[in-house]
A protein has these predicted regions:
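Short beta-strands and strand-loop turn motifs
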Residues: 29-31, 92, 117
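Rossmann-like NAD(P)-binding element
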Residues: 47-99
């Protein structure tokens, strides 16, 4: 399984590290290139765009701030859904409005892409202790 991860902040960063450390082939993308620096030498690869990340991944994880960020990444220029394949899965770890998740899910389903609404709780310490609560 090839994993793509977007959202390398205080919550998503440790999650992405855990995926990389778990040995999964992982592709990362960040709006701010400096967010990728902690992953140099880890085995993770870096995508030039969300579209490139989508094409390199079977599962794409989003851990971004909110509804507008999720929509922008899903449908915007270089949008994930346009470049993901049927059978792929989009996992939304962001805390977003249920209507946003339904909207993304409907558009994804039309392309054969699954969406999992999986917000997380516990922060970086829980990730590092491998005790992150995922509400799926």
């Amino acid at each position: 399984m090839r994993v793509g991860f977007i959202g390398l902040g205080s919550q998503g960063g440790p999650m992405a590290h855990a995926i990389v450390d778990g040995g999964f082939p992982t592709t990362l993308w960040a709006r701010r290139p400096e967010s990728l620096e902690p992953y140099a030498g880890t085995g993770a690869t870096f995508a030039e765009s969300p579209a490139a990340l989508a094409e390199a991944s079977d599962v794409v994880c989003l851990c971004v701030v909110g509804d507008d960020d999720v929509r922008g990444l899903a449908y915007g220029e270089d949008g994930l859904l346009e470049h993901m394949s049927s059978g792929d899965t989009l996992v939304i770890h962001s805390t977003i409005h249920p209507d946003t998740c339904r909207e993304v899910g409907e558009k994804a389903a039309a392309k054969g892409i699954s969406v999992v609404d999986a917000p997380v709780s516990g922060g970086a310490p829980a990730v590092e202790a491998k005790q992150l609560l995922v509400m799926a």
